[in-house]
């Protein structure tokens, strides 16, 4: 269960969301943005379709948008900072001329060392401006490998198409049967192929895409009651249950920590 201590965002529509938290485990989930995680205390076993390994204090690891991953702390809770940069923020850090194509992080984990030390030290500060973080990120990212190919290119055309259809229809509830019918394949074939490639069943992926979109709306200051309606949750209680499954806390607690909750 995630135990959030603090969370801050510099902009109403943030290019860089920073979260400080402690956690004992995360069930399989994903985020709609890039994730850069710096372990401050403890260690955790990380697992995704792209990589798996143990991250320790001082290490920094990475996930691409919609990359399913899970974590379990080896002993006590782990304390960590997570940066959720937008694509525009990463493009600026990397000084890329074109920003309209895909961009994926190929590096999985950087071990504690000169490449990670500056960023970890910057994140130790109680208050730090985005510009300072950006400078530290730029230096650390120079040690990473990036690709202009899609991070999902290896999952197969069927799964890629299914993922895109789900994301494009994230404002409405969808059944696996409906998705399979729209794609012209049998439900069992879709479930088997999708689950193997992505790391979760399509129905779970659908719910989590809606929850990820809810989180985006919440960082923009959209009231919780409106978020639940916009994303076709049956009611506020349903939204709260699904959000807590993914992030380990109710959406109200997330919004208050973010400082964007409009009463």
Regions found by a protein language model. Give the residues of each.
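N-terminal regulatory/effector-sensing and dimerization cores
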Residues: 2-102
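Histidine-centered active-site/metal-ligand motif
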Residues: 29-31, 69, 186-189, 203, ...
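Short, conserved glycine- and acidic-residue-centered signature motifs
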Residues: 32, 155, 159, 207
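Residues that scaffold the ATP/ADP-binding catalytic core of kinase and kinase-like folds
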Residues: 47, 92-94, 205, 227, ...
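Short hydrophobic/aromatic patch on the recognition helix
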Residues: 58, 190-194, 238-239, 243
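An amphipathic alpha-helical interaction segment
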Residues: 87-94, 102-168, 178, 189
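Terminal helix-turn-helix DNA-binding modules in bacterial transcription factors
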Residues: 164, 168, 173-177, 195-240, ...
């Amino acid at each position: 269960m995630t135990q959030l201590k603090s969370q801050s965002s510099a902009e109403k529509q943030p290019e860089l969301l920073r979260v400080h938290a402690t956690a004992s485990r995360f069930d399989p989930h994903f985020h709609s943005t890039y994730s850069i995680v710096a372990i401050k205390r403890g260690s955790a076993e990380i697992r995704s379709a792209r990589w798996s390994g143990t991250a320790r204090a001082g290490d920094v690891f990475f996930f691409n948008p919609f990359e399913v991953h899970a974590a379990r702390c080896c002993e006590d809770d782990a304390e960590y900072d997570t940066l959720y940069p937008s694509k525009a923020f990463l493009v600026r850090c990397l000084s890329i001329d074109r920003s309209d194509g895909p961009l994926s992080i190929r590096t999985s984990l950087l071990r504690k060392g000169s490449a990670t030390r500056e960023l970890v030290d910057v994140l130790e500060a109680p208050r730090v401006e985005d510009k300072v973080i950006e400078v530290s990120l730029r230096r650390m990212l120079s040690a990473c490998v990036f690709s202009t190919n899609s991070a999902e290119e290896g999952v197969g055309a069927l799964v890629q198409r299914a993922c895109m259809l789900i994301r494009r229809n994230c404002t409405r509830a969808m059944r696996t049967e409906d998705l399979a019918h729209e794609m012209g394949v049998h439900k069992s074939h879709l479930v088997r192929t999708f689950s193997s490639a992505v790391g979760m069943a399509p129905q779970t992926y659908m719910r989590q895409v809606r929850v990820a979109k809810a989180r985006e709306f919440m960082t923009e200051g959209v009231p919780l009651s409106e978020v639940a309606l916009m994303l076709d949750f049956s009611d506020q209680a349903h939204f709260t249950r699904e959000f807590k499954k993914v992030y380990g806390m109710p959406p109200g607690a997330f919004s208050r920590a973010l400082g964007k909750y409009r009463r």
